[in-house]
Amino acid sequence: MKKLRYSEAFYSVQGEGKFVGVPSVFLRSFGCNFRCQNFGLDRDRPKEKHNPEVADLIASDKLNEIDKFEDLPIIHTGCDTYASIYPEFKKYMMDKDVDEVVEHLLSLTPEGKWTMDNGQDIHLILTGGEPMMWQKFWPQLLEHPRMQDLKNITIETNGTQQITKPFLEVLASRPRIKLTWSCSPKLSVSGEAWDKAIRPEVVATYKHGLPNSDMYLKFVVKDSIDVNEVHKAVKEYQLAGVECPVYLMPLGGRSEEYELNEQAVADLAMQQGWRFSPRMHIALFGNAWGT
């Protein structure tokens, strides 16, 4: 039985995308094929192995003094979930089998189940890291007896990992579950290469044979340069048959930076007829772990 390596699971409100404000349990898997180390830095900065803040943290003695994941510092640049992607932080991860993961998830819900007595349902968000790197584990999770009242799943993915046949078959066998693909392709502001980050041929396969699924594209942007890239990317996705809503979300892993970009990005979204996604958890909680 395969175990899942994950950094955290928590109960909060969804802060981004289509389901903003919906009570949700988040399961953050470990590992990602990207580093996104340039978020918040100069766009033309040379790509390095680590984001500068992460590099300084790894090189310091601070990690010897930190025992728990939730005590790791929040960084101001790069990927805001850095501890879920860099191998240097493996020691803070949990490795649990499916029974343990299910028990952990349900313990976070108000009533110990996905569908509450009042008829409202709690959403499950598979996030990361890159959750599509754990496709061998997710079928175990969805097939577990205590997951059978789950009604809504969102998979937050960068849209670069091909869906496997076994995972697709399990999803197709559960039409009672509403599946939403929240695809967040990475633009050049992230520091990732276009040909590796923009993979429309991959995203186009996510809904095949899944009539009870939905999808949207969500781009992290800062300025008009990013918007020009969004236009280019959306055209490539459309040519591959991906027709879905497009969201713009402000760059900013901390309240100060987010607030500076929020209004400008909302204006850019309205000018293009695209949707605006806030990062409500930052406004509410300051982008702390477990939010």
Give names to the regions the model predicted.
Residues 122-124, 138-221, 227-229, 242-244:
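Radical SAM/AdoMet-radical enzyme domain recognition
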Residues 27, 36, 130, 155, ...:
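Conserved, mostly hydrophobic/aromatic
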Residues 98-102, 198-203, 230-232, 259-263:
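Well-ordered, non-membrane alpha-helical segments in soluble/globular domains
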Residues 2-15, 21, 212, 223-291:
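Auxiliary Fe-S-binding modules of radical SAM enzymes
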Residues 104-121, 145-149, 205-215, 237-241, ...:
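A structural motif corresponding to the C-terminal end of an alpha-helix
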Residues 4, 38-177:
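Conserved Radical SAM active-site core
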Residues 129-131, 158-160, 186-188, 220-222, ...:
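Active-site beta-loop-alpha junctions enriched in small/polar residues
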